[in-house]
Structures are given as C-alpha cells and as structure tokens.
Amino acid sequence: PIPNYMQGEPFLGLKKTSPRKFIYGHRDRVDEVRDLARSVRDQNFLYIRNYMPHLGYNQPTVWPDLGEIRHEFYRLTHEKMMNTSQWHFAGPTRPIEELYDCRSDPKNLDNLAKSKDYKKILSKMRKELTKHLQETRDLGFLPEFAAWKLFEGSSGWDIGKSKRIDLGAIRDAASDVGNANDKTLLANLESKNELVRYWGAIGFTAQKKKLSKHAKLALDNALGDSSPSVRIEVANALARHGTIKPALFTLIKELSHPNLIVVTHAARTIELLGKKAKAAVPAMEA
C-alpha cells in the first residue's frame, strides 16, 4: 500500500490515477548562485514567476565558467551580437512574469505575459501558482540564514505545518519586487518581520529608477538591521544605486560572520557588484 504521507500518485500500472492538470517547477540556489522563481504548467501553457528579476538567467558561476561555452556567451553579449531570444537568456535581468504557449512555441521564445489576448490565461495560471504556494507552504521565500535559525531543533516540514511564520506576508513582499512603489517598499523595509524587511531591501535593489531621498535614508538606517540577511541586501541596494563606501564596509564586515551561509551571501553580493566592489578584493582574498 502507498503510505498516506506520500504525495505522489501512480501514473503506470493497474492502480494508475487520473493525469494531473498542472505540474509545478522551482528555481532556487545552485552552488553560489542565488535565485528564486516558481512555475506552473498545464498541457498548453507555461507560467514562470521570477521573484528576483534583477538577476539574469546567465549568472556567472565558478564551475560552468571553467568551460569555453559560457565565455563565448559573455563575449557575444559584450559585443551586442545576441538576438532578442538569446538576450533573454544572456542579459542582466529577467521579466517578472513569463507566459509561453508550449504547443505553438515549444522553445518558449515568445513571452505572452504582456499580451492583451492572453490576459485570462495569465490570470488563471497566476492564481493556480499562488494556490499551490499557499497549499504547500513554500519555504523558499525565506533567506537561508533565517531558515537555518528557524529549523534549529525542528525541520522545514514541521515549521510549514505549524504556521509559526506568516508566509503570506513574506510572499507578498517578494511579489512586490519589481512591482511596488516606494511607499510599499518602505513599509516592507521597515516591517517588524525581518523576513519582510529582507524582501523590502531586494525591492529597492531591483528598482530601476534613482532612489528617492526617503528611500536612501531608510536604507542607510537599515544597514544596522539585526538580521545579517537584511544588512547584506540593504548594502546591495545602496551599492547598486551608487552609495558604495558604506555598502562595502557592511559587506566586508559580513565576510567575517561566524555563519558560512552569511559569508557566502556577502561574498556573492560583492562578486555581482563587479568593478564597483574593487575595494573589497583584499578582504575576499583573505
């Protein structure tokens, strides 16, 4: 007999069940590359929700970068020799939402998320993904350091079932990245919930316009946040918007944190800042 706690269903043999209407996907950290995306697909359409749209698909990674192919991608990108579809993969950012007709566009090259003709389908797939995230109590929206603290003496399974944390509020703050105005992002950054503050900081990192004076002041103050995950993302936001010295000071300090999750988070942030973070090289090499 199949144990009650197993969620899988037979798809072959005498006891096979009805086919699923939807399948779900996720994209999270791999090695040093941090990311967060979720997806849902039915027989016709694939919907992808990118919660870190300021990060491209083709992020630098130590192991793949040892080969020649990635460097060819970098060269073609630098020389602006990519077509639109290639740039979607190789470029520095991603759309917040992606929608593809998998039957007519099996390579997923034509993003329909902004097409008026597909508004109903987009809404349907968006709702289905939200429903799935709620039902599964998806913990992927927690920064890793906070997750490890929460899991001490327990497990992710137990935390999710217990409803000890407000996953809805955290997920809402993540959904604000790339979407919300300053008022909403500031409210997130100044929340009593450190997990919401984390996403508030990322929201300012992803913001394309120049920081307002109010936002910059709030971020300056947040460099002293009690959470290292928040401090790192606040420093990232400030550095990306031109306030380098205090941001690097904070990031370099986190390289000495006793928790290696924090250290790798800070190191990756410094790496992606590129030449802006040149002053941090000695600390990275130490």
Describe the residue ranges of each PLM region.
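A generic secondary-structure signal for well-formed alpha-helical elements
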Residues: P1-P3, K15-P19, N44, R49, ...
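Leucine-rich solenoid repeat scaffolds
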Residues: V281-A286
